[in-house]
Every structure is written in C-alpha cells, then in structure tokens.
C-alpha cells in the first residue's frame, strides 16, 4: 500500500511539472507571436524615413562572446565588428541568393538589414530558399526572411519591404542603406538598382545564379565602374533566362 502511495505521489509530481512546463511553453509562444506581430507591422514603410542606427562605440560582453570567433581574425577584430554593427545592408530579392545572404549578414551582426521582395513564399521555392518554411507558404518573402533571421539574431534590426521596387520608391529606400545587394533575377531591376545606387552614391553588390552557375560582381565601389558602364543597353528580352524558365540547382 505504501508503495502505491509513493507511486501516486510521484505521478502527481510529474503531472504538476508537466503542467508547469506547458504553461511556460504557452507563455513563450505568446511572446513569440507578439514579437512577430510587431515585426510584421513594419512591412508598409516605404514613405517612412528610418531612424539612424544607434551608434555603438564598444562591444558588450554578450557581443564579444557571440562574435568571438571572427573577432580573433586580424582582418576584422573589434574595430571591424563595431563598424559592422554600425552598418546597414539592403537586400533586394528574398529568394535563392537573398536567403543565404540574409542569414549570414544577420549571424555576422550587421546593424540593420532591409529585405525587399514583392513575392510570396511558394512550395517550389523551398528546395533552395532556405529561410522559408512549409508553414509560411503564402507569406511575404521579405517577412519570412525577417522572421527567420530574428530568431537567429534578435540584436539586428530587420526592415521587410513587401513591394516591387520602381522608379518612384527605389531611391528613397536605397538612400537609407550603406550597401545594396542585388539578389534578383530580373534584368530591368538590375538596371533600376544600378541607376539608383549611382545617384545615391551607394556600392552595389550584384549576384546571380542560373542552372549550375553563379556570378558575383561589385559595382560603383568608390566611384568605380557601374553595371550600365559594362552593359549600356539592356539585352533583348528573348535572350534572357530566369530561374523559372532555365532552372537552378538547390545547392549553394
């Protein structure tokens, strides 16, 4: 009889502990939903000027611990990490190139990360666009990337733009960032980004991937050559292939 009582007491303790843990999980889920809700409120900010980043002069103990493996690199060091924390990058295109670019910039500790894309997540994206998930099919790609990166590094400021860049909004958005990363597969957008970066005096890093090949080029660095310098006129539409038509392998 005493043995049965002990077992019942242990069972009750386990039930109480399980109930406690479930309550903690529910609280964490509510906190996560609230954070993601706050993040989603930033998707319509095309006319809103971003506040300047809060300048960091030294690294916190937490930052030193987080970034310790890259801090020991003489090419980066504490000075480089502080510069990174005080810098901003705008990624245009939240697909196969935008996803890995975003996750590594976030992990490295960039101060502000903007993500521009007009599209929503589709099932056909998931084999290569690694920050999107099955349960986010139908969500805006920019929001999906911001959500994933926020879970990786909440110390970075994420600014998702669910829109298509055009001649009206490109310059106001681009002007607020230090560097622009072109991760699109659209020739017209490449020329638009190039022209806006030249006007705004921003460096443009341009990447492309098709089938089994990839390219990476830096334009307008310290007033160097731009994309239009190399290709003054856009190619005929029938000569251009994108990922939807030509395919792309899902391995970086």
Residue ranges of each PLM-predicted region?
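Adenine nucleotide-associated cytosolic modules
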Residues: 2-252
């Amino acid at each position: 009889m005493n043995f049965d009582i002990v077992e019942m007491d242990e069972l009750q303790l386990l039930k109480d502990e399980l109930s406690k843990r479930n309550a903690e999980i529910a609280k964490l889920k509510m906190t996560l939903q609230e954070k993601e809700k706050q993040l989603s409120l930033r998707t319509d900010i095309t006319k809103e000027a971003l506040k300047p980043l809060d300048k960091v002069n030294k690294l916190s103990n937490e930052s030193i611990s987080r970034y310790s493996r890259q801090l020991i690199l003489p090419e980066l060091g504490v000075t480089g990490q502080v510069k990174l924390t005080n810098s901003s990058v705008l990624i245009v295109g939240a697909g196969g190139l935008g996803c890995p670019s975003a996750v590594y910039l976030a992990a490295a500790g960039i101060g502000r990360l903007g993500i521009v894309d007009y599209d929503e997540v589709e099932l056909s994206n998931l084999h290569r666009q690694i920050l999107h998930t099955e349960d986010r099919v139908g969500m805006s790609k920019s929001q999906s990337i911001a959500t994933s990166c926020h879970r990786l590094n909440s110390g970075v400021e994420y600014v998702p733009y669910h829109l298509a860049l055009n001649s009206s909004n490109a310059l106001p958005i681009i002007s607020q960032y230090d560097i622009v990363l072109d991760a699109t597969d659209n020739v017209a957008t490449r020329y638009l980004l190039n022209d806006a970066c030249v006007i705004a005096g921003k460096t443009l890093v341009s990447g492309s991937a098709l089938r089994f090949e990839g390219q990476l080029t830096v334009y307008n660095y310290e007033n160097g050559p731009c994309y239009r310098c190399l290709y003054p006129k856009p190619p005929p539409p029938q000569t251009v292939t994108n990922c939807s038509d030509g395919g792309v392998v899902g391995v970086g």
